[in-house]
A protein has these predicted regions:
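C-type cytochrome heme c attachment motif
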Residues: 14, 18-19, 85
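Residues forming the flavin
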Residues: 36-244
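Ferredoxin-type iron-sulfur electron-transfer modules in oxidoreductases and energy-metabolism complexes
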Residues: 1-10, 14, 22-55, 179-180
Length: 244
């Protein structure tokens, strides 16, 4: 049921483990670790073979966006026998997986390994094509039998607070892609670089943690992280025995 357990096994916060009823009495099932270990053992044993369809349907499909949703859709449609092309405006396929998730959380060769399998199955990739600019929707509709929109959310949430307009304040998705490109050797001096600077991160979730790790690796002088929620306890609270 999961096309890419090697991605989710590394990146998913595993709410299923928090909700696992086994956790009432003992430690919950380590679903995330089981998933990751299984797929890595399979890749290591070279048994993750491409699933090439027995016959083609003759239908052509364009998938716009090469993040996890677009790649999953493309793989399923290719395996069903359709001819699928994935369009991505960035120079490399992967979307948020490649340019949003830091290298220290998931190495990019993990993505490339899966893309190689998808290419063997028949999926075609069209990086560096900005749909709506380089090619119109009408052109795609005339070329393909169906189009899947998997462009993701490109509008971030902002904080309308005094001083927001000041210099040196960035959104996470302005900062992280440049950090990824620097780690990959695509740029030497990214336009947003916190080396030697004092950094304040607003937000204590996964994205905030990614910004923290990237800032430390760029050589920030200090990093302070602010979170609106209280610090969670080390153990399950006595008044909350049931998993959530």
């Amino acid at each position: 049921t999961n096309n890419f357990p090697e991605f989710t096994g590394r990146l998913c916060p595993a709410p299923c483990e928090t909700a696992c009823v086994v956790g009432i009495n003992v430690d919950p099932v380590t679903i995330k670790q089981v998933e990751l270990r299984t797929i890595e053992e399979a890749f290591g044993a070279n048994i993750v073979a491409p699933q090439i369809p027995d016959r083609l349907t003759g239908k052509t499909i364009a998938v716009i966006g090469s993040g996890p949703a677009g790649l999953a859709a493309a793989q399923q449609l290719t395996r069903a026998g359709h001819t699928v092309a994935v369009y991505e405006r960035a120079e490399k396929i992967g979307g948020l997986l490649r340019y949003g998730i830091p290298e220290f959380k998931m190495e990019k060769n993990i993505i490339d390994r899966r893309l190689a399998q998808m290419e063997q199955e028949g999926t075609r990739f069209r990086p560096g094509v900005n749909v709506g600019v380089d090619i119109t929707g009408s052109q795609l509709r005339s070329k393909y039998d169906a189009i899947v929109l998997a462009v993701g959310a490109t509008q971030w949430r902002d904080l309308p607070v005094p001083g927001r307009e000041l210099k040196g304040i960035y959104q996470a998705m302005e900062f992280l892609p440049w950090g990824n490109k620097q780690a990959l050797g695509e740029v030497e001096n990214p336009p947003i670089n916190v080396a030697g600077k004092h950094v304040v991160i607003l937000g204590g979730g996964d994205t905030g943690a990614d910004c923290l790790g990237t800032s430390v690796r760029q050589g920030a002088a200090s990093v302070t992280q602010l979170e609106i929620m209280p610090r969670p306890t080390e153990e399950r609270p006595s008044g909350q025995p049931w998993p959530t």
